[in-house]
Amino acid sequence: MVHLSPLLRPLAAFSFFTSLASTESIFPDCSTGPLSKNNVCDTSLDPVSRAKSLVAAMTLEEKINNTKYDSSGAPRLGLPAYNWWNEALHGVAEGHGVSFSDSGNFSYATSFPMPILLGAAFDDDLVKQVATVISTEARAFANGGHAGLDYWTPNINPFRDPRWGRGQETPGEDPLHLSRYVYHLVDGLQDGIGPERPKVVATCKHFAAYDLENWEGIERYAFDAVVSPQDLSEYYLPSFKTCTRDAKVDAVMCSYNSLNGIPTCADRWLLQTLLREHWGWEQTGHWVTGDCGAIDNIYADHHYVADGAHAAAAALNAGTDLDCGSVFPEYLRSALQQGLYNNQTLNNALIRLYSSLVKLGYFDPADDQPYRSIGWNEVFTPAAEELAHKATVEGIVMLKNDGTLPLKSNGTVAIIGPFANATTQLQGNYEGPPKYIRTLIWAAVHNGYKVKFSQGTDINSNSSAGFAEAISAAKEADTVIYAGGIDNTIEKESQDRTTIVWPGNQLDLIEQLSDLEKPLIVVQFGGGQVDDSSLLANAGVGALLWAGYPSQAGGAAVFDILTGKSAPAGRLPVTQYPASYVDEVPMTDMTLRPGSNNPGRTYRWYDKAVLPFGFGLHYTTFNVSWNHAEYGPYNTDSVASGTTNAPVDTELFDTFSITVTNTGNVASDYIALLFLTADRVGPEPYPIKTLVGYSRAKGIEPGQSQQVKLDVSVGSVARTAENGDLVLYPGSYKLEVDVGQDFPTATFTVSGKEKVLDEFPEPQQNATSAVTRWGR
């Protein structure tokens, strides 16, 4: 989300510049003036009653004018304009509802690593800490008149295809990992699980099955994602189920694409039957926004309905409450006159929106709201700086090391490549200006190194004009660092990749550097992976790190790893596929399981990876032992009966305990990844393995051990039937820890008859008469 369809981009530009023009208070005056006479200002009433009072006082024109992301308010009532569109993917981000000052207060915010790198840390507590800081800074910007209270983050679509331009915005490819990430992120952003008074509103996007931008001429605006109930339930929806049902996020964004023939923002089954009814997401102040231009796409790109009036009605009737675009304000009056929706449907949408603002304290006296006291002094604090650094260090993954790292001494280092002196490139997308960005060169100097710098080549250049200078710099150095990979000229919103090789002639330059027989370290940046086969095979490349988009702390964090100040412990949150993979399956094929024209997707269904999901090396060695070799036995009846009022799939199946021992010489964190395999259990085909739990053990000293407890939910042991039902099957199961290690395994059995834990609502079928679906 952010790039609009062409019809709406001038509108977005106007909104952006008008938002920069004012830093007045965003809050209404409930003490004097006309709004004080409305019960929306009566703090003794519940949020819904207060919102109903406000909506009841609006004229039809005022109602319609407030269904748009930059709502005009109602001056007659004393209701100010409000911008619902604010961004904070990895820190408060510039544009639309958010404005940064040119200097001084509110001219910067903390910039954390992009979610793909934060996801590589596999640290749920860290995710919550990062989200807590982001929400505090977001609230400070709102209180200072520089932003709204609603933030359209996080992106929790799983990173299914390595070519996806927006994979960098997600924590990875695994649905359990995404689900735990979003639970803790929403907890930190909203300040609790379903709080009566959220600090800010988070928005889980893009609902659903959205992971294509523009591939081979197929654009997201018109793409129809054809997904089976099994893949939908098992892979594309779990993170959204956790976000809404369990974490109780206050907002959801429907996506550009169609799902099985129906645009998601016009899909009543998706937004009403599944989201609100089946997942129980009907609490006060929960609302749905369309992605920016998505309601326009219903008729202009998907051709699902005949015109704008039918598109507006289709979206409103399906359960979309807010339009990030102009279709609602332009066509809702005409649609009402045609009888395409009723007035109460419009009222309900506005009540959901304004009851959310009531919960946020938008209409309350500042003295009654603890979050209203958050100010500029809580932005970019020393603790936030340290957390950004820590988050970056925790996520960096070591992919190769022949003993070159950690660096043994100072001396002269040649830093070469397009990321050698990069600044904003390190941030990825949806970024705001930080106070500083630490480059690799800055970090080298501050670690006592003499630096020889030469860029050598660009990200996607085929010119070798800079090679000679780079080779000369390398010859004068004791150690060579090549910093390259991909950036947002290669992968971004609106742009997928067509290949997953290193772009341009970067590998040619690395090859020539490797011939110098100097210690050579390659630091790979970018959200998506590239095929590292040649680097892994090249004996002249001593070490290889993946650093994602590390943001403000980037160079400093990388040098902490290079010098051994910190030990690498991150794990790949995605599969690194061979370059040939893109020739085997089109991006448009949404199927996960292997077939005649699909080699399979993600580590669960594909086993020919260059580097597998969960891979990551250390400066030390570890041993893992089970505290029990066998667990159970378990019975489907007792397991499926549940012990609390929580959904049974979230209940604890068991806690599996292991002992992790540092058998090397360097203190280090260790991420315990727990995978489940089963012997012909459930429907065919059978997954290679499934992540069912993880935990990051911190600071294990040489020779020391830590007990690690891995909680596994009932839903993690279950499998998904072809109709989408979540089913617990009897059978024999095996547990293994880590990737590519020969650690002992544990086993357990489940007896009894198969038990359905969750009946997946039957998806509606695409109707051929879609144009008339929303008629009288």
Curated annotation (Swiss-Prot):
InterPro entries: BXL (IPR044993), Fn3-like (IPR026891), Glyco_hydro_3_C (IPR002772), Glyco_hydro_3_C_sf (IPR036881), Glyco_hydro_3_N (IPR001764), Glyco_hydro_3_N_sf (IPR036962), Glycoside_hydrolase_SF (IPR017853), Ig-like_fold (IPR013783). Glycans are attached at N65, N105, N343, N410, N421, N462, N623, N766. Keywords: Carbohydrate metabolism, Glycoprotein, Glycosidase, Hydrolase, Polysaccharide degradation, Secreted, Signal, Xylan degradation. Belongs to the glycosyl hydrolase 3 family. Its EC number is 3.2.1.37. GO terms for cellular component: extracellular region. The keyword Acetylation does not apply. Residues 1-23 form the signal peptide. The gene is bxlB. The active site is at D291. Xylan 1,4-beta-xylosidase involved in the hydrolysis of xylan, a major structural heterogeneous polysaccharide found in plant biomass representing the second most abundant polysaccharide in the biosphere, after cellulose. One of its GO terms (biological process) is arabinan catabolic process. It is found in: Secreted. It catalyses: Hydrolysis of (1->4)-beta-D-xylans, to remove successive D-xylose residues from the non-reducing termini. It comes from Aspergillus flavus (strain ATCC 200026 / FGSC A1120 / IAM 13836 / NRRL 3357 / JCM 12722 / SRRC 167). This is Probable exo-1,4-beta-xylosidase bxlB. It is an enzyme of class 3 (hydrolase). Its main location: secreted. GO terms for molecular function: alpha-L-arabinofuranosidase activity; xylan 1,4-beta-xylosidase activity. Pathway: Glycan degradation; xylan degradation.
